Amino acid sequence: PFAVDVYGEHIHLQEYDTGWLMADDEYEDWLAQVIEAVVFVTGFSPDDIHLKHRERQKGTQQYEKTGRAGEDFEHGRRFWVNLDKYLDTGLFLDHRNTRKKVGDSAEGKRFLNLFSYTGSFTVYAATGGAVSSETVDLSNTYLDWAKRNFELNGIDTAQHQIIRADVFQYLQTASQEGKRFDLIVMDPPSFSNSKKMPDTLDIQRDHARLIDGAMSLLDSDGLLYFSNNLRSFTLNEAVAQRYETKDISKQSVPDDFRNKKIHQCWEIRHKAV
């Protein structure tokens, strides 16, 4: 199977490995037919279709890395996307509704972006009028990418800081320093065993601790967006008891996504005293 995503005037066509094996010639013919079908259905030129597929007979290298990249526009914001080189493009389309909600509500807010990836939520917040922000991730690659996205949108990095840190450690330090935010986005991976982290991350196991840490930084009338893409995920009952939680997944997943379980998303607030 393939996933077809439209980025402006380009199509990102990604093959998913099901273990189905074909001879090399048969496989190449099949790929050509897939591209021909996409051209027919979408009307895009073959030159604007970026095929990301399994390389064959290339040892441990699983995907082609041709490295073509360029800018993409979303709701008036500019983003640097790479449609060929990496498994991900730099901009997850399934969260474009959530990004717009952040941009629409950021005016005058202090914003925090945890597990920030390439900083797209911060781009929306900053261009939406946030007075300050902190963008936190452990990956230098993604933080450099975020900086590039900031530059594309004229965002001042003195006012909108990019911070390399383990999120667990950041939450502890920020709480000790008395930092407060009005709007927080936390979109962690389902699992991570990065050597840069002191411990592994298992979002089902660890999400309550992460949410508690984020809520300790959230102003009394603030809002946390918490999301993840673990299909089997269930929100900890203690979290639902401690805070006001609202599942907005049906609104956050765009209508044009066939897979309505591509992520789950909650609005979380402090309970009124």
Where are these regions (language model features)?
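S-adenosyl-L-methionine
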Residues: 138-183
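Mobile active-site "lid"/loop adjacent to the S-adenosyl-L-methionine
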Residues: 142, 164, 181-213
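C-terminal catalytic and target-recognition region of SAM-dependent MTase-like enzymes
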Residues: 209, 222-273
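Conserved SAM-binding motif I beta-strand of class I
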Residues: 132-137
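Conserved SAM-binding loop of SAM-dependent methyltransferases across substrates and taxa
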Residues: 118-130
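Helix-to-beta-strand junctions that scaffold the AdoMet/dcAdoMet cofactor pocket
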Residues: 218-219
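Non-catalytic substrate-recognition/targeting regions of SAM-dependent transferases
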Residues: 3-5, 12, 28-92, 100
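Conserved class I S-adenosyl-L-methionine
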Residues: 108-117
